[in-house]
Amino acid sequence: MATGKQILNEAKDKMAKSGDALRRTLADIRAGRANASLLNGVKVDYYGAPTPLNQVASITIPEARQLLVTPYDESSLDNIEKAIYAANLGLTPQNDGSAIRILIPQLTEERRKELVKDVKAELEKAKVAVRNVRREAMDDLKKGNKDGDFNDDEFHDLEKKVQTETDNGIKNLENIAADKEKELMG
């Protein structure tokens, strides 16, 4: 059976991973600026196999609101253009014969508000994940207490520590989401 400290450390690690996952998810929500990660999910039909865009082309940011996609193999230019359209990112690629330029449109106020709603929805999912970790840790602690692995005082102390970690984890998630909201509305 795991010790109280092991249960607490495992819960801390899982809660930290929820924060990392939220950060990664929110990075994909664009804020009106060019960012190569906007194209992370794009798969290009490259000789019959769906291949991530970053493996068939270099993605650079020549200006604040422009991406430049330069294929390693110019024959794949049309497939790259089709893949960007098919990804439904709301972006319009412009093929100039040797590379593809993508202008990132300014976000409208309405679109910004929609994106903030998306941020809040992702925040809620992450909070649920943290609460599930808390529940698992509490269940493990109760089982350990019942099995006699630690006494009632240790159990209550560990229970408080798990709750403190949960509160800290949720506060961290809220800070991550608040930063993204500021970025979107800024």
UniProtKB/Swiss-Prot annotation:
Pfam families: RRF. The keyword Ubl conjugation does not apply. GO terms for biological process: translational termination. Keywords: Cytoplasm, Protein biosynthesis. One of its GO terms (cellular component) is cytoplasm. It is found in: Cytoplasm. The keyword Transmembrane does not apply. GO terms for molecular function: ribosomal large subunit binding. It comes from the Bacteria. InterPro entries: Ribosome_recyc_fac (IPR002661), Ribosome_recyc_fac_dom (IPR023584), RRF_sf (IPR036191). SUPFAM superfamilies: Ribosome recycling factor, RRF (SSF55194). Belongs to the RRF family. Responsible for the release of ribosomes from messenger RNA at the termination of protein biosynthesis. May increase the efficiency of translation by recycling ribosomes from one round of translation to another. This is Ribosome-recycling factor. It comes from Limosilactobacillus reuteri (Lactobacillus reuteri).
